[in-house]
Amino acid sequence: AAVGVVAYNGYTKSAKVNAVKSNHALAVKVITAQLTRVDIDNQIEAWNYSSKKCELRTAHVNFDSNMGLAFSCLNEDPQYKNPFNNSDNEGAFWQNWDVPNVQQIGRTACNYRSDKDRIDCNSRWGEGANDYETTIIPRF
């Protein structure tokens, strides 16, 4: 039975790691798609705090503001839970450009960096020094 518990624990950790990687890919996809939409028709999907859902609206004039609007559909939506910690009040997505620290395992953090004129997305899935993924989205 002990072997089964070890195998199960390994499976659940692997599933959580895969969920973090999937969330990372989703964040990059959503941000890129929404910023492309801004370039095409000056529209963007953003979280509506009154209706508690994502809705199409006119884009902001600033790139960094539009990044925040695009990401709000993820980081404000309560359906996205931290795969490693369901009671994490920040959820799976967090608007920040830093790599989440080991206390924040399971989070995907994205934000515009004005000092580098780009968007950094970082996701942590473990306690190791290299247990995270980074994607840089250049300004376009």
Which residues does each PLM region occupy?
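Amphipathic alpha-helical segments typified by the pilin-like N-terminal helix
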Residues: A1-A25
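Context-gated lysine
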Residues: K13-K16, K21, K29, K52-K53, ...
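N-terminal alpha-helical signal peptides/signal-anchor transmembrane segments
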Residues: N23-N42
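Periplasmic/extracellular, small/polar-rich flexible segments of pilin-like filament-forming proteins
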Residues: T36-F140
